[in-house]
Structure formats: C-alpha cells, structure tokens
Amino acid sequence: MTKRRNLFMVGSSFTIDHLPPEIWLCISKLVGTSDLHNLCLINRRLYLTITSDEIWKRRCYDRWINRESLDILTGNDYDSIPVSQWYSYYLRRAKWENKIFCLLWGLTEETNPQHFREKYLHILQFRHYKLATFLHRIIKQGYIPDKRPLDLITYANYLLKNVRHKYVFPLFYPTNAAELKNLNNMASRDAEMIYLRLSAIDTSFDDLLDAREFILNGICSDLLQKYKKIEEFLKLRPVTRVSKLISISTDYLDCFTQPHDSVGQTNDRATGRELHREDFMLLRVYSREGRGYKTIILAIIQAITKRYNVDSYLARDHLVVSEPDFPDGRAFVTVNEDFQPYIFDKEDLLSVWSNNFHNAENFESTVLPALLEPISIQHLLTEFFRELLRCKPRPFEGYPNRAHGLRDMFPYGKVEVPRDVTMYFAFIYDLFDGMFESGMTSLRGQMLRDLLNYVNANNFGDLNIIIGQNALKEPNDCWSNKRDYVLLDDNNKIGYFYTDIETEDTLCALNQYEVDGKVFITTIDILGDIRVRLAEGLTPFQGDNDKLWESFSSVVPRTDWGLFFKGYDKERRRMQLNPYIEEKLSNLANDEQPLHNL
C-alpha cells in the first residue's frame, strides 16, 4: 500500500502531472461531455488537468481538422489556422454556426412563401465554406425527433446543393482564358478532383467519403506491412510504385477484376467494405453496368499514386507517368479490354500503335503527340457524360420492396440520385454535344441561359451565386413549390402509410379525393417520388408502423418528405405535418374553398 501511494506522491517522477501532453490529448479524445461532468464531481484535479488550455485547445484543433477533412470541397477556401490562434477561432466559429442553425430553424417555422424565399436566400449569404461543413454535419446527423425535424434536414440538403453549385459551374463556364487554361491543367493533373466536383451536385455522396478514406488507408496499411517505413517505398522508382499500388488496390476495388469474377456476385459481397468503381469516384449510381471505364480507372490509379509522390498526367487513353529510368523519361499506363491496367515504355507503345500505320516515322512525329496530349476539361467532361449518363439509374425490378432493398441497391449511399439531378447532368451533356458539333469553344448565348434557367428552376438561389443578382428572372417553378402543387384537402387523410398491391412499395398519403366515382390518393414513396394513384391499387399498411418508420427514417430526410412532414407521431402511428402544411390546411379550411378543379 505504501509503495503504491509513493508512486503518485507529488514530486515523484511517476506522478500523473508529469505525463506528456500527447498522453493527455489521447485521454481527452475518449472523454465525453457526461464523463467530464462526472469527473468534475469525483476528481476535480484530474478534471482541471484534462480541460486545461494546453490540452483542450489542441483537442479542439484536432477534432475540427478531422471534421474539415471529411468535406473535400472546403480544403482550398481558407488558409490553415495556426494552433496558437485556433482556440479563439473555434469559439467564433461556434457562434456563427449557432446563428446559421437559428436561421435554419426559423425556416422550418416560416409559413409565408415569399418570406420563406427571402430567409432561404439570406442563409446563402454566409460564406460558402462556412455553410458547407456545417450543413454537411447537420445532414449526416440525420433525423432526431424534436431536435432535427425532417423539414430542417430537407432544407439543409437543398442549401448544400446551392452552395456546391458554386464549384460545379466554373467547370462549364470559365470567365476568362487564364481560368480555362488552369482548368485544363487541373483536368490532366488531377482528374479525380474533376469527378469529385461534378458529383458535388449530389449531396448523398458525403456518405462515401468515409468508405473512400477506408480504402486509401487500407492500401497504406498493406504497404506498411511490406515496408517498415513509407520512406522505403518512396525510394522505389515511380513505375515500380505504380505497379505495386495497382496490385494492392486489386484487393479493395472491383474495377480491376476479370469479367467472370463479377458473375454471381452475392449481396454479402456487395455490402462489404470493398469499394466499387463508381463509389470510389463518388458517382456510384450514374451507371448500372458492372465494368469499369478506362478514363475513370486511370483516374483512380492517378488518385492513389498521387498520394505516394508519383508525378503523372492523364491523356485520352493513357496515364503518363514521369519515369527517369525509361526511354524518353516516361512510362505509360493503360487499360486493356478486360479492364486490367498494365504498364509499358515508349518502345512498346510505338510497336502497338504503329502497326495500324504504314509510315512509322510519320506516326511518331504527328500522331503520337496527339495521343499523349493532356486531356482537356471539355474532353474529360464529355467522356464523363457520354459513358456514365447513357444508362439510367439502376432499375428497381429486382427489389420489389424499396424499404427493405436499399442496402442491396446502394450499399454505401443512403438514397438514389434524384431525378432532377440526373436530368441536370443529361441536360448539360446535350449542351456539350451541341457545343462540339457547332464548333463552339465555350458555352454562350441561349444554351447558357437555358442551362441556368433549368438549374434555377430546381434550386432557386443559384443564379445569385453564379452570375450575380438579377442576371435572369427567377422562374416560379422551383423545388419549394412542390408543396403547393400537391392538392391538400383533409388533415385526417394525410400522413398514413399504404402498400402498393402490385410492387409492394411502401407509400405515404398526401391527399385523398374522389372524381367520377373513383378514389385517388396522392402518395410519396421513400425516395421522394410524388404520384397520384388509384386507391384500389393500394392497401393500408398492415405491419408494425414503428418498425417501418425505423427502416427508412435515415433515408427520407434527404428527400422531399420534409416539404410536408416534420417527423413521425408514434401515438397516432402517422407522419406529423410541418408548420407550412398545417398553415396551408388551416387557411383552406377557413376559406372553405374547393382545393381542386378536376
């Protein structure tokens, strides 16, 4: 007993006061708010040690940096804050985050359409990097009864779309020649960022960032098992690094497997930690095909090798790697018909391509430079639209009940790409197709106006971000008006669950009315699709409503359910109407006017 007490005597070399700050920092990361409260009551000296400025400031700094790294779009918007200044910045940031949240909460209580629009645009006036990370976190937390209602998450989702349009539009509408040149350079040097920015239009891609980081960390762990230090691996010549990284990546990515390997793939594998081609590039559902595309696979290889100091650029069909030991100082990576990447030198490249040309010398002087020219932003975008948008999103035939098939359909994401997002990309593809056919070098004139008008119809507020105030007249047909287009009649008919007799889909009623002796029910499914259906094709849900809600409560906040509902009422076993819809029904009841004229 005496020896044990002596170990912790003040002044002893073993006292806890002499533990290095790194140890206290690790301890503080494991301590939650309730733990700190209990610790304050039990051992105030230990509590003061953990919460001291020296430890707590560094903990705040580390936590914030980790949170920032989750959002790939915020990295270049402000300089990193020195540790010495971080604590005060952390406190300031918490203040304006609370302000944003108050404004967002006020948005859920607004019942006047014009005032709603004004408040929505007011939130967009915050700097985009402030909004992006905060909204990202709100959406990721999901629906929390009484704290994070459905309508709040839905509005946050639309706001985040608005913010991220700022990153998408410069890809299509560069303001000057210098900016266009920089974009082209970025396209060849870092094709991954192009795909990430394109995918930023779909906010559900946030769920894939953790899985993507898991893959990159797994590759690093495998390297550390083979090499004691990463520095040993970095000493290898670039082409060797590329080869070994491709080999290791095969264990994590499905884009390098042989075609017969994907046949008979089970759901168990689909829900594992393997990351699919579209998942890695955060474009998982724009194509339903099981094989990879050359440009995307090469961009994946480029993204992985870039982390290990491999200098490369992306050409049309090749990834060109700087390799001093090879002739001409370059090595070439391409993908064969079986989507297997392989590496070769210039001599092999000439022997393969020159067989198709009678004059080998003419090929090397004229054709080869064109083949190895860095890919331009226009060609990269065209490749993306041509390959990934020719297919519709994955069909639902194999999943009769969407509520129980979401994990099989989208093992990493939580929701299908919305129809308006698919239309957005398809619309831009048509513009690019017409642009190249007409020989135009940039989007101009009516095509640009059509594009901006289309996007603005689905996401009002974008025009102010992109090209300034009052550049185009905002149309009345925007996403917020969906709640006004749905015919509402009786509160007692809204919010109950139904099952489609034919497809077994789970639906929620938005209205019910009778026309010419037939009863119609306006429904919304768990993906936010609103349709009018015959009542004879539906049946009231017979199962456990509470379990049903739990099965898709993580999905619907990212859809348009929040335009009508704020949560689930367990006592009444139905959805709760949000303030906007309640106000609308109240006004209609007071006016006693017909709600539809069919």
From Swiss-Prot:
Domain F-box: 13-59
Alphabetical list of SUPFAM superfamilies matching this protein: F-box domain
Pfam name, any one: F-box-like
Principal cellular location given in the protein's record: cytoplasm
UniProt record, GO biological process: mitochondrial fusion; mitochondrion organization; protein ubiquitination; proteolysis involved in protein catabolic process; regulation of mRNA export from nucleus; SCF-dependent proteasomal ubiquitin-dependent protein catabolic process; ubiquitin-dependent protein catabolic process
InterPro entries in the record: F-box-like_dom_sf (IPR036047), F-box_dom (IPR001810)
Localization, UniProt: Cytoplasm; Mitochondrion
A GO-annotated cellular component: SCF ubiquitin ligase complex
Pathway note: Protein modification; protein ubiquitination
Quaternary data: Interacts with SKP1. Component of the probable SCF(MDM30) complex containing CDC53, SKP1, RBX1 and MDM30. Interacts with SKP1 and FZO1.
Protein name as annotated: Mitochondrial distribution and morphology protein 30
